[in-house]
From Swiss-Prot:
Zn(2+) 2 binds at residues 100, 137, 175. The active site is at 248. Keywords: Hydrolase, Metal-binding, Pyrimidine biosynthesis, Zinc. It is an enzyme of class 3 (hydrolase). Its EC number is 3.5.2.3. InterPro entries: Amidohydro-rel, DHOdimr, Dihydroorotase_CS, Metal_Hydrolase. This is Dihydroorotase. Catalyzes the reversible cyclization of carbamoyl aspartate to dihydroorotate. It comes from Pseudomonas fluorescens (strain ATCC BAA-477 / NRRL B-23932 / Pf-5). Homodimer. Zn(2+) 1 binds at residues 14, 16, 100, 248. Pathway: Pyrimidine metabolism; UMP biosynthesis via de novo pathway; (S)-dihydroorotate from bicarbonate: step 3/3. One of its GO terms (cellular component) is cytosol. The lineage of its organism: Bacteria, Pseudomonadati, Pseudomonadota, Gammaproteobacteria, Pseudomonadales. It comes from the Bacteria.
Amino acid sequence: MSDRLTLLRPDDWHIHLRDGAVLPNTVADVARTFGRAIIMPNLVPPVRNAAEADAYRQRILAARPAGSRFEPLMVLYLTDRTQPEEIRAAKACGFVHAAKLYPAGATTNSDSGVTSIDKIFPVLEAMAEVGLPLLIHGEVTRGDVDVFDREKIFIDEHMRRVVERFPSLKVVFEHITTAEAVQFVKEASANVGATITAHHLLYNRNHMLVGGIRPHFYCLPILKRNTHQEALLDAATSGNAKFFLGTDSAPHAQHAKEAACGCAGCYSAYAAIELYAEAFEQRNALDQLEAFASLNGPRFYGLPANTDSITLVREEWTAPASLPFGELTVIPLRAGEKLRWRLLEDHS
């Protein structure tokens, strides 16, 4: 087994960078590894149109480390009030690459999200016409639905209907967490893809709940039972081009996670590709990592793959116990624990 792994530079097709004073920290972490990233728009207020996307993009570019060529790929936040004209303008601007459907109340800063998918059908028609992909947080939010069943029920009630109604619309089922989602994506047309996070490949709900509640494993969609984790590992390592890397790295300050009502999100960007390598190594599938991390996403979005490369070496190191987050701190995934792979710096 090789102790060195070289890949075309990967991209992250789902990340939260937040805004303001924390951007120099979050942008540096993603730019260390990834050439591009799909930037989630759930700020306060959200990124609703091309002008707001451009302003956020400029703040991200200004926060890049010196010499970085990292490219943020911007996303619009869909609301009940989004207009088809805003979709056409976003597509025409060249730097908006998708629009995001958050069911209202599904996750962090989603209160402005869509209350009924039927309300945005004219917007989805415009997206299909101009070729702007739809990114979906696939969970229902009704109070009578068990949190572990939100994704499965969303598929049955909404996802099937959307892809059948708009067959030419490219749809990314984001951060999938269940065997049902894997099966849905496999059976859908080539216009449907899915991102998978490192934490859903490496962990299941036992890691979060057995022996005490571990808030830094709490995310949405929530970690599921190990049978779903196995289905995700099967999909990610299968070579199926419909599945690609999306960290859903979502930082919250330490005090906001370690609280009586803690926030949802895992911060993995600081060592994302190293964590994915561990997951793929568990399946003896390191030969499939480049396709998942570097090729499948660009192909789905109609973009060229990166031409430079990164190299990982099999070398144990200890993850930091905390990281700077503006004037505060964030506790990263795997804080204080050993990682088995290390990224060689400045290999391009």
